[in-house]
């Protein structure tokens, strides 16, 4: 069980209240697909992913990026039970989609970069620490089925 400080809880809720899902979600997923091209293999039904322009302009990438952020809302609302919150999603990604769990960390890193760019100087080291702790718990929960 993860212990959250009052500061961490407030920070996570505050960061997610400021995120523009329609901008950040697509940008984070697109960045992941561009920077780590091997992650594209899980999105074969998304059509053209041949270069950065195609990826960033792909409406299926954008839609799934938004879906990912809305999925993170569940963790924000259930910070004391993220593991069980993502139990079914963990099974889906491991048993049906066969996603390499290391890719969750790559996406989390890309999301951190995009959020930091959006927030600018307001994304202090303390805020980043809380945000990355939160994402690490999410990544661990999504990868739980693999262990």
UniProtKB/Swiss-Prot annotation:
GO terms for molecular function: haptoglobin binding; heme binding; metal ion binding; organic acid binding; oxygen binding; oxygen carrier activity; peroxidase activity. Keywords: Heme, Iron, Metal-binding, Oxygen transport, Transport. It comes from the Eukaryota. This fish has two hemoglobins: Hb1 and Hb2. They display the Bohr and root effects. InterPro entries: Globin, Globin-like_sf, Globin/Proto, Hemoglobin_b, Hemoglobin_oxygen_transport. SUPFAM superfamilies: Globin-like. GO terms for cellular component: blood microparticle; haptoglobin-hemoglobin complex; hemoglobin complex. Belongs to the globin family. Involved in oxygen transport from gills to the various peripheral tissues. CDD domains: Hb-beta-like. Hb 1 is a heterotetramer of two alpha-1 and two beta chains. Hb 2 is a heterotetramer of two alpha-2 and two beta chains. It comes from Cottoperca gobio. Disulfide bonds: none annotated. Coiled coil: none annotated. GO terms for biological process: hydrogen peroxide catabolic process. Heme b binds at residues 64, 93. Gene3D superfamilies: Globins. This is Hemoglobin subunit beta. Red blood cells. Residues 3-147 form the Globin domain. It holds the Pfam family Globin.
């Amino acid at each position: 069980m993860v212990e959250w400080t009052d500061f961490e809880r407030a920070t996570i809720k505050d960061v997610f209240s400021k995120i523009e899902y329609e901008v950040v979600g697509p940008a984070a997923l697109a960045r992941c697909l561009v920077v780590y091209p091997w992650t594209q293999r899980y999105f074969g039904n998304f059509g053209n992913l041949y270069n950065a322009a195609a990826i960033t302009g792909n409406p299926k990438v954008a839609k799934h990026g938004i879906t990912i952020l809305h999925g993170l809302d569940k963790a924000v609302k259930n910070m004391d039970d993220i593991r069980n919150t993502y139990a079914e999603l963990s099974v889906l990604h491991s048993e049906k989609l066969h996603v390499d769990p290391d890719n969750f960390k790559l996406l989390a890193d890309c999301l951190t970069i995009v959020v930091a760019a959006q927030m600018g100087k307001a994304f202090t080291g303390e805020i980043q620490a809380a945000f990355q702790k939160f994402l690490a718990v999410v990544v661990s929960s999504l990868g739980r089925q693999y262990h």
